[in-house]
């Protein structure tokens, strides 16, 4: 059993849902050497999250953004506003979606379904770079 951990910094992005699967895989060349295992992705931020969702239709990403804005509106009268009106809603959305994902590895590839991709959910309007800790645990190919 081998363990590899990498810290990946994603480019700055403003509010929205972004497919980042290829960005992550490109920065994890060791992934190809694992016959089986898991990889955990953990975002080190409280105003962004990680999720797995549909990759085919960009409208799903826009709809996710719109739905979360309705569930957690900026106009709810939050006490925590020191970093802007979008900050506290970003914290709530991040807590609802979550900071981490675990994906199986099969024959050197992420075992995602046909229509699945890993997505960054960025909840702040101003662009931010985001840091993700990636931990691979598994068996290497012979």
Swiss-Prot record:
Transmembrane segments: none
Family: Belongs to the UPF0047 family.
Protein name (database record): UPF0047 protein C4A8.02c
Organism field: Schizosaccharomyces pombe (strain 972 / ATCC 24843)
Lineage: Eukaryota, Fungi, Dikarya, Ascomycota, Taphrinomycotina
GO cellular component: cytosol; nucleus
